[in-house]
Amino acid sequence: MSALGTRRNFLGRINLALTGFAFTRALPFQNAIGVQEPVAEPVDYYDKLGITKRINAAGTYTYLTGALMSPSVQAAVAQAAKHPVFLEDLQKAAGEYLARKLRCEGAMVTAGAASAVTLATAACITVANGSPASHAMPTDMNGLKNEVIVQKAHRYDYDHAMRNCGIRFVDVQTLREYESAFTRNTVMCFFYNAADAGQISREDWIRVAHAHGVPCLNDAAADVPPISLVPSGFV
């Protein structure tokens, strides 16, 4: 057989394989060997696992599994589960869409409040140390900027979400202490929106930080709804 014939046979097999791949993608509920899988009957997995259902009269708290999803959101999740996509494409497009809806500079979908705090802290460290956005956050913090200013009354159970990034907390209590706490190593100021304690208001916290050119992270994860509070988190 000629080399040309061999190449044609090879390309023909490749084309057939790609056609089969495309056909398989068009049938998302078929398994790997092309057998149609039966539709699963609804299962109450909380009952199956022996978990007691609760009435959430508190708010959108992580320990209460956040908030119930509306039927439209459940339908969107079910639809999205039918097709694979590149995760980076999804993150970028979803973030841009949410930013437009929320009228803010940028947005990112995270796995929850703790991961949001970690990612925001990592972003502030990366920017403060002059690392390009395309590079990973520094893992060796020796000699790098890593200080996060926080009110002592705002230290809470999610401190570890920031500590995971290798930061060092600088605790303050009064406005005077806060104004004097900034150094060349300050990368972020943290504010816990749900904390009633603390001598420094959110408005003063943001004002002083921005006067020093330092970004603020406001954990307001459990403070929406009402939707009118959304802008308070973008500082």
Summary of predicted features, one role per range:
Residues 76-79, 93, 97:
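A non-catalytic, amphipathic alpha-helix used as a structural packing/dimerization or gating element
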Residues 10-14, 39-55, 59-63, 95-106, ...:
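Conserved PLP-enzyme active-site core in the AAT-like
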Residues 52-86:
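Glycine-rich phosphate-binding segment of PLP-dependent enzymes
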Residues 87-92, 106-107:
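Flexible, glycine/charged-enriched surface loops at secondary-structure junctions
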Residues 1-32:
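N-terminal export signals
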